[in-house]
A protein has these predicted regions:
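Proline-enriched interdomain boundary motifs that mark the N-terminal boundary
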Residues: 220-225, 388-397, 582-588
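C-terminal beta-strand-rich structural cap/linker in extracellular carbohydrate-active enzymes
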Residues: 453-464, 564-583
Length: 663
């Protein structure tokens, strides 16, 4: 069985794991949205502590929607989203499109981009102070830049473009109308997504310089839940090696009424949101601080997020697996291993708290929004060293065995109805070698056993008459290049593919390759090569698809080399190879004031489209949210919509549909 191990072990781990290390013949080991809006490759920027706050005068930026009038936000900077921090403000547009979008300050249009996904139609204005404001999900660009874009579209014969401009090409004044608001790209409804970035492309909180008079906020953040989690193998919370979640029964709750028992190294987690006046949207917090017995332990401020690589690090800032399985977004109030962000202020423990037996710890959490509204939370931890007490229950009639992995700890849970006749120990096996684990504690009728996997991976786990195979093939450390190969696949991990150590789990069955679980997150892409067990006949129309739990398939692609196909992925999950031989569908649904086509594809999805009118190219715009292709108005460059026309659409597999029309 292939394995990967790190070269050294800290003294504490060695003392815990040495017996099994020697038994197995192993050497001791240790453990270390938003999509990008440009095709340019960036190297992740290293974190070096909290970033300096840019000096911007209060009132320098104009609110770009309805300036001078009361307005509302649909989302604030730093909201916790799957795979990204929300990078700016979502400004409401009265539920409609085509509101004027004003330049927030003097500067010049430095860039624009069009896409059916992500930011949609997006404009960038660079200002004399070096900052850039970003305006996303636009419906239309206005002014001379719109004409330059249209010429480029016809020159390249494609709608989606990215253009960069010099300082003197398209200057703008503060308050100049530069675009009309929209609902393009990944938007779920009409609004303006507005960002402020610095010269290094860090996303900055636009509210950090005094806010805007148009946006009022007198509402303090609201606590939804907090949690205490064991972070070391000897740690317990309420006597167990489990995260304990505490949900207030009344709102607001500022003092938790019950003392929480704990021991060992623990971390605090928080679920909370903020609201603005007269708006029901749940927004993010700007700052969270933690003090223990009056001394600072941890703080973070979401005013500066590196883009694009830093924003995906939200998956390490929150408990990603808990969010995926329990639907509750808990942000860690400690800096977890592999978290590259620089928005934290901590001491040497990085926000972790070591709880000792018999001592009391008063924990104060302070939640703040960008307008200075504050909500406190206070709770008490009391140190209680765990002790093993044997329990029995007549409710369990047969032995049972299951296991799970939390960080580096293997947690074995075994039901033992009769400890008098059966051994109370669980056994880890590797070949002919074995290690007996004594129970760490019991809960109801179950024994719980804890083992640090950095000491070596077992082949199987035995309890009484039950033996189960341990289905993790290798330990993959983060921070290094690592490879894994078997008869069905190859995996290639880069130095920044993983946030932290991975205990690799792969399988192949009935044409489906499973790599880990989607409950776990990747930082940068993982390279995979799939090795089909039979020859794939039509490779030109066959590709890799991500298969969800309900059997739905999403196109991934891949490059064929012989009978193997390689691709990159940002997600774990189930992958299959499928062949798409059916062309896309297209239907003309409107001629009024232009052409509107409804398009669809049964598997791989739309790849390209082209409309020729009288043999000349005519621009079409694609909107994936409602699966339509349509002509834009005005369009003074393309041919008029009269006479014979041909629409040609192609899917990702190369299947083509041609429709001839007489306009």
């Amino acid at each position: 069985m292939p394995n990967s191990f790190l070269p050294t072990a800290p003294r504490r781990l060695l003392s815990l794991a040495l017996p099994f290390v020697l038994l197995l013949g192993l050497r001791p080991i240790s453990c270390g949205g938003q999509e990008a809006d440009s095709a340019e490759k960036r190297n992740p920027k290293p974190a070096a502590g909290p970033a300096a706050r840019p000096a911007v005068a209060n009132g320098y930026f104009l609110l770009p929607i309805k300036p001078g009038q009361p307005n509302f936000l649909a989302a604030s900077m730093g909201e916790l989203r799957p795979n990204h921090f929300h990078g700016g403000l979502d400004i409401k547009t009265d539920g409609r499109v085509d509101l004027p979008v004003y330049a927030a300050a003097e500067g010049y249009i430095s860039r624009l981009k069009q896409s059916s996904f992500g930011y949609g139609n997006v404009l960038y204005i660079t200002h004399p102070n070096g900052l850039t404001t970003v305006y996303g999900h636009l419906n239309r660009f206005l002014g001379p830049v719109a004409g330059a874009l249209r010429q480029k579209q016809y020159e390249k014969q494609t709608y989606e473009q990215e253009m960069f401009f010099a300082k003197d090409q398209f200057p703008v004044k503060r308050g100049e109308v530069v675009a009309l608001s929209g609902n393009t790209g990944g938007s779920a409804g009409p609004h303006l997504h507005w960002e402020v970035r610095d010269a290094q492309d860090n996303q900055l909180n636009p509210l950090q310089w005094g806010g805007f008079a148009e946006i009022q906020d007198h509402i303090a953040p609201m606590l939804q839940a907090f949690a205490v989690e064991p972070l070391s193998i000897d740690a317990r919370v309420q006597g167990r090696f489990d995260k304990a979640v505490f949900v207030p029964k009344t709102i607001p709750t500022t003092v938790w009424p019950d003392t929480i028992t704990a021991f060992g190294t623990v971390g605090v987690l928080l679920q909370a949101f903020d609201r603005f006046d007269n708006a029901w949207n749940k927004n993010g917090l700007q700052r969270v601080e933690v003090r223990v017995n009056g001394q600072p332990l941890y703080a973070h401020t979401v005013d500066n997020v590196p883009f694009p690589e830093g924003t995906r690090a939200v998956n390490q800032h929150v408990d990603y697996e808990w969010m995926m399985t329990q639907g509750r977004t808990l942000q860690k109030l400690f800096v977890d291993d592999g978290n590259p962000l620089s928005m934290y202020t901590t001491g040497p423990t990085k926000g972790r708290l070591r709880v000792e037996d018999g001592k009391t710890y008063t924990v104060g959490v302070k939640m703040s929004d960008s307008y200075g509204n504050v909500t406190p939370l206070t709770f008490v931890l009391r140190g209680r060293q765990p002790s093993y007490t044997k329990t029995r229950s007549a409710a369990v009639r047969q032995p049972a065995l299951r296991w799970e992995i939390t960080r580096n700890i293997l947690k074995v849970i075994a039901a033992d109805p009769d400890t008098a006749r059966q051994s109370a120990n669980a056994v880890l096996l590797r070949g002919s070698r074995r290690l007996e684990l004594k129970p760490s504690y019991t809960t109801q009728s179950q024994n719980v056993y804890l083992y640090d996997l950095r000491a070596g991976l077992p082949d199987s786990i035995r309890f009484g008459p039950i033996t189960k195979r341990f289905d993790r093939q290798a330990l993959i450390p983060s921070g290094t290049e690592q490879g894994y190969a078997d008869n069905f696949l190859n995996l290639s991990f880069g130095p920044q593919t993983l946030f932290d150590t991975l205990y690799l789990q792969t399988s192949y069955k009935d044409g489906i390759w499973t790599v880990q679980s989607p409950r776990q997150s990747l930082y940068l892409p993982l390279r995979l090569t799939l090795k089909p067990t039979t020859e794939v006949a039509d490779k030109t129309r066959s590709a890799v698809y991500l298969v969800n739990a309900r059997g739905g398939r999403s196109y991934v692609g891949g490059k064929w080399d012989g009978n193997q196909v390689s691709f990159a992925t940002k997600v774990f999950g189930r992958f299959g190879i499928f062949t798409d031989t059916i062309p896309p569908t297209v239907r003309l649904v409107s001629r009024a004031g232009g052409l509107v086509f409804k398009v669809g594809d049964d598997l791989s999805g739309l790849a390209s489209y082209q409309l020729l009118v009288g043999g000349r190219f005519r621009l079409l715009r694609y909107e994936h949210k409602n699966a339509t292709l349509f002509t834009e108005r005005p369009d003074t460059v393309g041919p008029p919509l009269r006479g014979p026309a041909t629409l040609r659409i192609t899917d990702q597999a190369g299947n083509e549909r041609v429709v001839n029309l007489n306009l």
